[in-house]
């Protein structure tokens, strides 16, 4: 199979492969509970992560049915919904653990944090930092950094929340954190011996 959002090619057991469907909604919260019935007390262990896609089959009050489960309508957005500010909800991932290769509430890495918000807005973004740095072509100087700009190191990326703060899935702290931009640059230079190699405007 080929992953649409990444372009990666891999293999999956055929019987576990879902038939093609046209999604109608996507999860807009960090993790959404599912229910056996459209009743709160029937909550299941299964949860859906941010940007999971579903095909709605039925609506019942405050719930929508998909497959053999129900999910709260308030945890969903229509499939074509886009945030005006692409990273406006990025803080929902604050404190989520760092996990290399992860892309969910169970853990994610720095490049995934960037990619999933692009994917939520129905836009393509490469999976790896090297390709992301090439993909975003508008170069700016660090002194001109502002909200939503991207800061790249070798193998790492952070997203500016303002002129002074950034958010990133940071391996050494093992979680998604909000930090001062210039203290972070100094810290990474001192600990990992890495300098900023690019700043991009999306």
Residue ranges and their predicted role:
Residues 13, 72-74, 109, 178-183:
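Helix N-cap / beta->alpha transition motif
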């Amino acid at each position: 199979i080929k992953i649409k959002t990444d372009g990666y090619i891999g293999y999956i057991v055929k019987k576990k492969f879902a038939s093609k469907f046209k999604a109608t909604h996507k999860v807009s919260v960090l993790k959404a509970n599912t229910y056996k019935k459209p009743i709160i007390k029937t909550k299941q262990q299964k949860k859906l992560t941010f940007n999971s896609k579903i095909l709605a089959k039925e609506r019942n009050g405050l719930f929508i049915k998909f497959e053999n489960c129900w999910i709260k309508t308030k945890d969903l957005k229509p499939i074509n919904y886009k945030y005006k500010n692409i990273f406006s909800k990025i803080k929902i991932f604050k404190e989520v653990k760092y996990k290399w290769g992860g892309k969910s509430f169970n853990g994610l890495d720095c490049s995934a944090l960037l990619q999933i918000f692009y994917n939520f807005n129905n836009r393509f973004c490469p999976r790896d930092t090297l390709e992301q740095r090439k993909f975003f072509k508008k170069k700016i100087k660090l002194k001109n950094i502002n909200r939503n700009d991207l800061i790249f190191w070798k193998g790492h990326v952070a997203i500016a929340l303002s002129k002074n703060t950034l958010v990133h899935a940071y391996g050494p702290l093992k979680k998604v954190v909000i930090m001062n931009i210039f203290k972070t640059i100094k810290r990474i230079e001192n600990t990992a011996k890495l300098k900023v190699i690019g700043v991009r405007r999306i």
